[in-house]
């Protein structure tokens, strides 16, 4: 399992199955009640000196604010099956007449994830002026190796008056990732227009329709706005038979959450043998116990604010900057061992500077219902929107021991 593995990347079984994973729990998660940085300009486009795609920011806003209608007809049903949205900004592109060649670094795509949708988004005026275009897709890692992934032809209708053209590359990417096959096909991809507000139009591109100048030009990311050419991948992490460690903890410290089956068996054997010895030392008393008035402690939900900047995660988490994760509190003699039932919430809690009394939890006073949370962050030069399970305590209660 990756962090946010987003990132979101944006999976849980609950009565809200009909709702997209990235939208589940939104009834209780609101910018006012959960997100602590409500004063932050959520429309900011700068992060660590880099501009992040306007599309990713809009998608994040739509998710946390429940704007289903703002999603396209293709993206809305896809989000119901996805928990991660990953964006890849083009490293460079070349044009020769009406032939466009795009280069992306897709090294961070996990083959263990199930690809749901791949969209190529091109927001260049020169591309809109072309009528018949051939597009070649390449994977490149640090510009050293260029691997051809597939190609397609499309006719752009002049009636499609929009800022961006969006192409469905799901089949192309699935064929390459699962079978290693290159896909070359004519007209299998339909162009559709998608209007993006606040699209930067500062960059100027030469008209590639001037065939007389067949000289090849190469443009790099620095020459145009970040979202001008971008590949957006919607995916879902594959389910496993064994329960996975917290996605946040596994992302940062994978070795810490490694599981040694042999060690578990040995520890289990020692624990069983110790319990047997303890049982043999128990003596039955003939004196009846005195009646004790039973006082049930209160198990309640209290605030637990998480500031990602303070725990050292501010350099890669874009939104939210902070949030209220809550925790369960009750008087208890025996604290809970948080390693027994590790969750994203317990991992976050272990990083906070809580007092000993705040850190202790009763084994019987535990979260009864937890919510997931979508996060937008920067990883491996890619911007990722990922949905993480068990991030916020919604209800506390006593469990049977």
Swiss-Prot record:
Keywords: Cleavage on pair of basic residues, Developmental protein, Disulfide bond, Gastrulation, Glycoprotein, Growth factor, Secreted, Signal. Its main location: secreted. Changing residue 328 to S: Retains neural-inducing activity but at reduced potency. It comes from the Eukaryota. Residues 19-274 form a propeptide. Disulfide bonds join 299-365, 328-396. Changing residue 299 to S: Retains neural-inducing activity but at reduced potency. Induction: By Li(+), siamois and wnt signaling, including wnt8 and lef1. Induction by wnt8 is inhibited by vegt. Not induced by vegt or activin. Gene3D superfamilies: Cystine-knot cytokines. Residues 1-18 form the signal peptide. GO terms for molecular function: cytokine activity; growth factor activity. It is found in: Secreted. SMART domains: TGFB. GO terms for biological process: gastrulation. Glycans are attached at residues 168, 337, 341, 344. One of its GO terms (cellular component) is extracellular space. Exhibits mesoderm-dorsalizing activity and neural-inducing activity, but lacks mesoderm-inducing activity. Regulates the expression of specific mesodermal and neural genes. Induces convergent extension movements at the embryonic midline by activating the fgf signaling pathway to induce t/bra expression in the organizer region. Acts with wnt11 to induce Spemann organizer cells and induce axis formation. The unprocessed protein antagonizes bmp-signaling. Monomer. The propeptide region interacts with bmp4 in a non-covalent manner. The propeptide region is both necessary and sufficient for bmp-inhibitory activity. The propeptide region and the N- and C-terminal thirds of the mature protein are necessary for neural induction activity. Although cleavage doesn't appear essential for activity, residues surrounding the cleavage site are necessary for activity. Belongs to the TGF-beta family. This is Nodal homolog 3-A. It comes from Xenopus laevis.
């Amino acid at each position: 399992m990756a962090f946010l593995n987003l990132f979101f990347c944006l999976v849980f079984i609950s009565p809200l199955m009909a709702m997209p994973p990235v939208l589940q729990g939104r009834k209780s998660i609101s910018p006012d009640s959960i997100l602590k940085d409500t004063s932050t300009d959520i429309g900011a486009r700068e992060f660590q000196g880099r501009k992040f795609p306007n599309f990713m920011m809009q998608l994040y806003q739509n998710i946390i604010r429940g704007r289903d209608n703002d999603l396209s007809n293709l993206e809305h049903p896809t989000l119901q099956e996805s928990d991660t949205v990953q964006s890849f900004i083009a490293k460079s592109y070349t044009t020769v007449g009406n032939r466009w060649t795009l280069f992306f670094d897709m090294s961070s795509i996990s083959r263990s994830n199930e690809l749901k949708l791949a969209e190529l988004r091109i927001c260049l005026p020169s591309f809109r002026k072309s009528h018949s275009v051939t597009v070649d897709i390449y994977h490149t890692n640090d510009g050293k190796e260029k691997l051809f992934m597939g190609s397609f032809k499309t006719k752009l209708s002049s009636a499609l008056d929009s800022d961006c053209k969006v192409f469905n590359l799901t089949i192309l990417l699935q064929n390459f990732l699962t079978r290693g096959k290159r896909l070359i096909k004519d007209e299998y991809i339909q162009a559709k227009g998608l209007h993006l507000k606040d699209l930067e139009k500062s960059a100027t591109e030469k008209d590639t329709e001037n065939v007389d100048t067949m000289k090849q030009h190469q443009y790099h990311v620095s020459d145009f706005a970040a979202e001008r050419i971008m590949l957006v991948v919607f995916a879902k992490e594959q389910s496993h038979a064994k329960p996975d460690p917290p996605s946040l903890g596994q992302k940062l410290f994978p070795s810490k959450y490694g599981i040694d089956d042999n060690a578990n068996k040995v520890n289990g054997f020692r624990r069983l043998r110790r319990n047997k010895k303890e049982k043999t030392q128990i003596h039955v008393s003939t004196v009846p116990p005195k009646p004790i008035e039973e006082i049930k402690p209160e198990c309640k939900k209290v605030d637990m604010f998480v500031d990602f900047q303070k725990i050292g995660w501010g350099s890669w988490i874009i939104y939210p900057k902070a949030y209220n994760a809550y925790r369960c509190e009750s008087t208890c003699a025996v604290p809970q061992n948080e390693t027994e039932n590790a969750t994203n919430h317990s991992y976050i809690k272990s990083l906070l500077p809580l007092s000993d009394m705040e850190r202790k939890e009763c084994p019987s006073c535990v979260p009864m219902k937890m919510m997931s949370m979508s996060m937008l962050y920067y990883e491996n030069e890619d911007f990722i929107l990922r949905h993480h399970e068990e991030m916020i305590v919604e209800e506390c209660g006593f469990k049977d021991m």
